[in-house]
C-alpha cells in the first residue's frame, strides 16, 4: 500500500498513541520523519526517539511524554500537505497559540522549529503545528 502523506501518518500515530496512553509508537522511518522527531524532542514534546533496523526496514520509535497522566501534546496539526503546500517567509512565520506552541518548518538549512528559523532569518514550508 502506498502512502500519499507519510508525515500526516506519523503525526496521526503520535496523536492516537497518546490518546490510547501508549508509552511509545513505532512507524516506518525516513529522513524527514527523523528530523521532525528531533524537533519534537528538542522542544520537549516527546521524551526521545530512536531508529532501528528490522528485517531490512528502518523503523522510527518515538517515546511519548505525559505530565500527571495527561499527554504533553494537546494539539498536533498538519499544515502543509501534498495537495496544498504552505510556504512562509521569515516575516510571516506563524506564532502558534501566541508563542506557546511550535511550528515545524522545513527550510533550506533543514527542518527546525519556527523559533530557530526566526533566529536564522529564513522561512520555508510549514510542516505542522504543535501545542
Curated annotation (Swiss-Prot):
Cellular component, GO annotation: ribonucleoprotein complex; ribosome
Record's keyword terms, sorted: Ribonucleoprotein, Ribosomal protein, RNA-binding, rRNA-binding
UniProt GO molecular function: rRNA binding; structural constituent of ribosome
BP GO annotations: translation
Domain of life: Bacteria
Family affiliation: Belongs to the universal ribosomal protein uS8 family.
Purpose: One of the primary rRNA binding proteins, it binds directly to 16S rRNA central domain where it helps coordinate assembly of the platform of the 30S subunit.
Subunit structure, as described in the record: Part of the 30S ribosomal subunit. Contacts proteins S5 and S12.
The name this protein goes by in its record: Small ribosomal subunit protein uS8
Species in which this protein is naturally found: Hydrogenovibrio crunogenus (strain DSM 25203 / XCL-2) (Thiomicrospira crunogena)
